[in-house]
Curated annotation (Swiss-Prot):
The active site is at residues 229, 391. It comes from Aedes aegypti. Its cofactor is Zn(2+). It is an enzyme of class 2 (transferase). This is Adenylyltransferase and sulfurtransferase MOCS3. ATP binds at residues 82, 103, 110-114, 127, 171-172.
């Protein structure tokens, strides 16, 4: 009897696998048929589309002709993260005929508080496939195209040229310049958004005679002054607000509506829940890329131009000489030998509360750079022995060491040293149970 039961289980599992394969094949056939049907029906709305989009079709700003414009349009969303997820979601819901999703990354647990098209089951999957799966379940009437690549000067023009509008939902400076220049060369509007901490910004570049990104920022900022979500943090609802507004601006461009944020910058303050609308400087007459006589007529090496990587991943600064730094292994050996020293943790107080190394004192980086507590640090250093500086990933600690070195030298103190890689390196190389965030 027991053998028969095991046999039945195996047979059922085999049947289920077969049915799943058949279902997958049928689903693919259905998608292919729908795409073929939709391509041949771009001049009218079917009954399903009329019912689905009825609440926006009845708006005088849209109507049937407006919905057909949306159906015939194509939008590329660059970045499937905090901004890209809500933007793609509302574009798909509105009935954009073809939506491209471009991202090189995979879903991580740290994404889920703000990138709400991904789920716990998506962790480890590519972001583009995770978004595609969600959007196809939301709206099977539209086409979702995935680009699992990192955008570069070599592939940008070819990738962007088949879309009407580009949505910049990225989080790094080099890619912003790349997207701007590519959109100018291809004569495509660029809907640009950003979000950090509890604030967000939104504008539209290269549209209706308005400025491009280079008109406003001809030169990139120094790498050490740039903060991304990984360093500065962000509240998920902020990215939701800005991402949804990016979708709105995109829809307005497609419909030909007035009021597009070209030449204007929308600022959102999540602290006070207020919006401000600022007028931007006009198009620059001598802009390197969008002027009548541009000096840039092809894409360049943007990582070299910006002196930073074209990636949303946390960057690693290299500001100090080797003798000004110490590895986590070296620091562990020193601490276990009970050598007198002072360990200064320059993270913010809220981050220090999450986790800290034994005997460390918290002096936030802002208090050091603005000389609010440097006297305190030098006094402790005079009696506590050599100073080692740590932060989350080893960037702010370098800034702190660079700032403190001159003060220490003036007072005859041993120079401070940075712990390479910060607390992330401690978790990876010393204590895997130490919290990482």
């Amino acid at each position: 009897m027991e053998v028969d039961g095991e046999t039945q289980i195996e047979e059922l599992e085999c049947d289920i696998r077969t049915l799943r394969k058949q279902l997958k094949a049928k689903v693919q056939q259905l998608k292919t048929l729908k795409k073929h049907f939709q391509k041949n029906c771009i001049n009218k709305l079917n009954n399903n589309e009329i019912a689905r989009y009825s609440r926006q079709i009845i708006l005088s700003e849209i109507g049937v002709q407006g919905q057909l414009k949306l159906k015939r349009s194509s939008v590329l969303v660059v970045g499937a993260g905090g901004l890209g997820c809500p933007s793609a979601l509302y574009l798909a819901g509105a009935g954009i005929g073809r939506i491209g999703i471009l991202d090189y990354d995979e879903v991580e647990l740290t994404n889920l508080h703000r990138q709400l098209l991904h789920t716990e089951c998506s962790v480890g999957l590519t972001k583009v496939e995770s978004v595609r799966s969600y959007l196809e379940e939301l709206n099977s009437q539209i086409e979702i195209v995935t680009h699992h690549i990192q955008l570069t000067s070599d592939n940008a023009l070819q990738t962007l040229e088949s879309y009407d509008i580009v949505v910049d939902a990225t989080d790094n400076v080099a890619t912003r310049y790349l997207l701007n220049d590519a959109c100018v060369l291809l004569k495509k509007p660029l809907v640009s958004g950003s979000a950090l901490q509890l604030e967000g910004q939104l504008t539209v570049y290269n549209f209706n005679g308005g400025p491009c990104y280079r008109c406003l920022f001809p030169n990139p900022p120094p790498p050490e002054t740039v903060t991304n979500c990984g360093d500065g943090g962000v509240l998920g609802a902020i990215t939701g607000v800005i991402g949804a507004l990016q979708a709105l601006e995109t829809i307005k461009i497609i419909l030909g509506n007035s009021g597009v944020l070209s030449g204007r910058l929308l600022l959102f303050d999540g602290h006070q829940s207020t919006f401000r609308n600022l007028k931007l400087r006009p198009k620059k007459a001598d802009c390197a890329v969008c002027s009548d006589n541009p000096s840039l007529t092809k894409l360049i090496d943007y990582e070299q131009f910006c002196s930073m990587k074209a990636t949303d991943k946390d960057s690693h600064l290299n500001l100090l000489a080797p003798h000004e730094r110490i590895t986590v292994q070296e620091y562990k050996s020193l601490a276990e030998s009970n050598v007198p020293h002072l360990l200064v943790d320059v993270r913010g107080a809220n981050q220090f509360e999450i986790c800290q190394l034994p005997a460390s004192i918290n002096v936030p980086i802002d208090d050091i750079l603005k000389n609010r507590r440097t006297a305190e640090v030098t006094q402790l250093a005079a009696t506590g022995g050599p100073v080692f500086v740590v932060c989350r990933r080893g960037n702010d600690s370098q800034l702190a060491v660079r700032h403190l070195s001159q003060l220490f030298q003036e007072q005859g103190l041993a120079p401070p040293r940075d712990i390479v890689g910060g607390l992330h390196a401690w978790t990876h190389n010393i204590d895997p149970e130490f919290p990482i965030y």
